């Protein structure tokens, strides 16, 4: 007996029924792409109506765009100038390298593990590259290779090798502003003091250009330079020169000569942020002026203050142990 063939005509109503149900569910659940069903929309509307004003504002608020701030007028000091008083800190990796940099292992990873390793990070140099002269770029590369060397044989050579930070030297400008330590701005009408936690560094910015008792030119080269300032609207402009040539911009060996000239701009753009810019000029090292920029953040911890950083005590044996009556072996 031959096997009976399936009656496909009988299957047609079932197929049509399944198709119709699928279309019904599709239209009911999602009548328009991106919209909830009517009942769900009604529930959502009820929930929206029940929101507090704060919740409603948060739901419609735009996320901030990095690098952009809404208009802001900083509070004023008694003499009408923008009030920059406070403790500030940068949160960038520029102290490692002011240009874009990859992560690197630290010295002796077999002993130190991850301690001393360099994290990767974005640079703060506008345009991405420092415009070195060819011979100066070769010196920068030599600095990078010798950044961990501290081979002191006499005071005549103590600046020749090693990152100055390694030896706890005063960091210089602008490096002091982006090291991983806070600093405090203490603002007065005729001068501004900036105290840095690292190496107990200090700067005085003279604000009264008409005061004839204050030299208009640096009386001597110093680690932090000679600084004069003025306000341009809400921006503090600080002009510094008269630097010793011994500081670096970072651990990567970026450096300058004693012809360094730095113009800094501090603009408070919110109660908690200062946008910092520095234009750097040194005709002995660079082919043209160049600029760096980054935000500074107000430290808001209760009772925040600078702490004593006895950096010198950490390196006395390293630098001068050979002169000790009982040198360590």
Residue ranges with predicted function:
Residues 2-3, 13-329:
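PEST-like low-complexity, intrinsically disordered acidic/proline/serine-rich tracts
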């Amino acid at each position: 007996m031959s096997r009976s063939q399936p009656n496909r005509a009988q299957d047609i109503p079932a197929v049509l029924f399944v198709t119709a149900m699928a279309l019904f569910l599709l239209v009911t659940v999602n009548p328009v792409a991106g919209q909830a069903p009517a009942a769900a929309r009604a529930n959502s509307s009820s929930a929206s109506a029940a929101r507090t004003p704060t919740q409603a504002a948060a739901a419609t608020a735009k996320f901030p765009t990095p690098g952009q701030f809404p208009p802001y007028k900083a509070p004023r000091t008694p003499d009408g100038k923008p009030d920059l008083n406070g403790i500030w800190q940068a949160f960038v990796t520029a102290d490692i390298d002011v240009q874009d940099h990859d992560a690197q292992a630290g010295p002796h990873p077999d002993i130190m593990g991850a301690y001393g390793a360099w994290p990767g990070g974005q640079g703060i140099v506008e345009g991405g590259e420092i415009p070195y002269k060819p011979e100066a770029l070769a010196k920068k590369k030599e600095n990078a290779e010798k950044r961990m060397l501290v081979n002191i044989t006499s005071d005549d050579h103590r600046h020749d090798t090693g990152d100055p930070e390694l030896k706890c030297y005063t960091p210089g400008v602008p490096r002091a502003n982006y090291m991983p330590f806070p600093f405090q701005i203490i603002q007065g009408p005729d001068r501004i003091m900036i105290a840095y936690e690292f190496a107990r560094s200090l700067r005085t910015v003279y604000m009264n250009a008409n005061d004839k008792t204050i030299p208009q030119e640096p009386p001597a080269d110093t680690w932090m330079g000679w600084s004069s300032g003025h306000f341009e609207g809400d921006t503090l402009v600080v002009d510094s020169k008269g630097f010793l040539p011994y500081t670096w911009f970072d651990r990567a060996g970026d450096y300058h000569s004693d012809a360094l000239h730095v113009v800094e701009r501090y603009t408070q753009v919110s109660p908690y942020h200062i946008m910092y810019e520095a234009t750097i000029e040194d005709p002995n090292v660079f082919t043209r002026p160049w600029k760096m920029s980054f935000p500074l953040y107000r430290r808001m911890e209760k009772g925040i203050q600078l702490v004593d950083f006895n950096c010198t005590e950490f390196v006395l044996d390293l630098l001068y142990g050979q002169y000790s009556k009982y040198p360590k072996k």
